[in-house]
UniProtKB/Swiss-Prot annotation:
It comes from Pseudomonas savastanoi pv. phaseolicola (strain 1448A / Race 6) (Pseudomonas syringae pv. phaseolicola (strain 1448A / Race 6)). InterPro entries: AAA+_ATPase, Chromosome_initiator_DnaA, Chromosome_initiator_DnaA-like, Chromosome_initiator_DnaA_CS, DnaA_C, DnaA_dom, DnaA_N_dom, DnaA_N_sf. Oligomerizes as a right-handed, spiral filament on DNA at oriC. The gene is dnaA. This is Chromosomal replication initiator protein DnaA. GO terms for cellular component: cytoplasm; plasma membrane. PROSITE patterns: DNAA. ATP binds at G219, G221, K222, T223.
């Protein structure tokens, strides 16, 4: 069974899956051929369990279809193809923590020459330990506090500046936003896995996944989760050396250390923390000296059992200008996508924020805002603050009419960006059909289903009435549009393909 066949099938699967699913679960897999057997390596137990439950069946189908009809012999293992000798797999704490949320059954081993797969537990491997890790340097005679220059403007709002005395003259300053906790983080389908992973790391330090890498667009909650982990670690151990910073702060500290001839003190500082939380790691791109120093710091921390949490606006392997050895190491732990919140989660976020602000927000008002502000949580909260301020200054209760007044410029922009014409064009491109097909009388499934999806999106994303939507879809009756919307809502619950299609199109149209 050739590696080339596997790669061919993976490329076919790439076309079937949303990019974030493919990047999170399939791309980290490594493969090597051992005689007639394919050995597929997952970076950790959690990825192994998820791939086995969700994707292995389809992969085997593709291998059979493109392997001259022969059932492939395949083993799914934990580890790396570069590992010389498999070792026993560690426990899977996150799988247990997230089992209720994800309904994923833990798999102790996987092997197959048919769809049902099971591998001897002894054959399951884990990544080899870090080799050739740079030793901790002794501090220089000059005292160097990397975080001393961080001003209040550089720290998050309401952040707590907190110092912990360590060996010698070094001090660790942690700028953690105390308002970012697990308790006030609104969980939904879009962030369920990320939240479970972050909680596992926070509640079981040194026994969770290391590093934890969260990626996704701006304003989706990555930084909130990172601060929540730090706050929980300090709650459990007030003397813990937890350092949060933006990647640019790390670069600035290194430059300062070089200028002061205090690079050894810099190394000692960052390699003696209990947890290092770095935001927006993509800013390391094309900064070779910074990447070199972070590479050795990262190795030293993992070798010492200290926790590392990183965030980025994209999947780590897609960060251009980042060294391959760093990308590889980021995959040693767990990499999780944080996606834009779905409608129900957006409503829940608004209701929770209103409750925290002690403001009466009617559910229909929250629903109205959530329907129109879809890109990220930050914009959602900003819109709510404008509405609350408008309500306060005008001395009026929050109603849909007041929301229209306070957000009129934002709503006008949204209406301009999301039109029925744009929806039709986007849906036609997605399903590889013509716009004229959507407007035609054709009833074949390949055309009717995309047409129903486009109608449902038009109802959700625009302010047009059902008759108006029907009119721009070839003069159809409003009852046809209503049926299409109900049908798509039903299919979103029962058909995973339609659910993913709708989510992808919604993301494309609103970001």
């Amino acid at each position: 069974m050739s590696v080339e066949l596997w790669q061919q099938c993976v490329e076919l699967l790439r076309d079937e899956l949303p990019a974030q699913q493919f990047n999170t679960w399939i791309r980290p897999l490594q493969v090597e051929a051992e005689g007639d057997e394919l050995r597929v390596y997952a970076p950790n137990r959690f990825v192994l369990d998820w791939v086995n439950e969700k994707y292995l069946g389809r992969l085997l189908e593709l291998l059979g279809e493109h392997g001259q009809g022969m059932a492939p012999a395949l083993s799914l293992l934990i580890g790396s193809k570069r590992s010389s000798a498999p070792r026993a797999a560690p426990n899977a704490p996150l799988a247990a923590a997230a089992s209720q949320a994800l309904s994923a059954n833990s798999v102790s081993s996987v092997s197959s020459s048919a769809p049902a797969m099971a591998t001897p537990a002894a054959a399951v491997a884990v990544p080899a330990p870090v080799q050739n890790v740079a030793a901790h340097d002794e501090p220089s005679r000059d005292s160097f506090d990397p975080m001393a220059g961080a001003s209040s403007q550089q720290a998050p709002a309401r952040a707590e500046q907190r110092t912990v005395q360590v060996e010698g003259a070094l001090k660790h300053t942690s700028y953690l936003n105390r308002t970012f906790t697990f308790e006030n983080f609104v969980e939904g389908k879009s962030n369920q896995l990320a939240r479970a992973a972050a909680w596992q790391v926070a509640d079981n330090p040194k026994h969770g996944y290391n590093p934890l890498f969260l990626y996704g667009g701006v304003g989706l909650g990555k930084t909130h989760l990172m601060h929540a982990v730090g706050n929980h670690l300090l709650k459990k151990n007030p003397n813990a050396k937890v350092v949060y910073l933006h990647s640019e702060r790390f670069v600035a500290d290194m430059v300062k250390a070089l200028q002061l001839n205090a690079i050894n003190e810099f190394k000692r500082f960052y390699r003696s923390v209990d947890a290092l939380l770095i935001d927006d790691i993509q800013f390391f791109a094309r900064k070779e000296r910074s990447q070199e120093e972070f590479f050795h710091t990262f190795n030293a921390l993992l070798e010492g059992g200290q926790q590392v949490i990183l965030t980025s606006d994209r999947y780590p392997k897609e960060i251009e200008g980042l060294e391959e050895r760093l990308k590889s190491r980021f995959g040693w732990g767990l990499t999780v996508a944080v996606e834009p919140p779905e409608l129900e989660t957006r409503v829940a976020i608004l209701m929770k924020k209103a409750d925290q602000a002690k403001v009466d927000l009617p559910h229909d008002a929250a629903f109205f805002i959530a329907q129109r502000i879809r890109s990220n949580v930050r914009e959602l909260e900003g819109a709510l603050k404008r509405v609350i301020a408008h309500s306060h200054f005008m001395g009026r209760d929050i109603t849909i009419e007041l929301i229209r007044e306070s957000l009129k410029d934002l709503l006008a922009l949204q209406d301009k960006l999301v039109s029925v014409d744009n929806i039709q064009r986007t849906v036609a491109e997605y399903y590889k059909i013509k716009i004229s097909d959507l407007l035609s009388k054709r009833r074949s499934r390949s055309v009717a289903r995309p047409r129903q999806v486009a109608m449902a999106l038009s109802k959700e994303l625009t302010n047009h009435s059902l008759p108006e939507i029907g009119d721009v879809f070839g003069g159809r009756d409003h009852t046809t549009v209503l049926h299409a919307c109900r049908k798509i809502n039903e299919l979103k619950e029962s058909d995973a393909d339609i659910r993913e299609d709708y989510k992808n199109l919604l993301r494309t149209l609103t970001t």
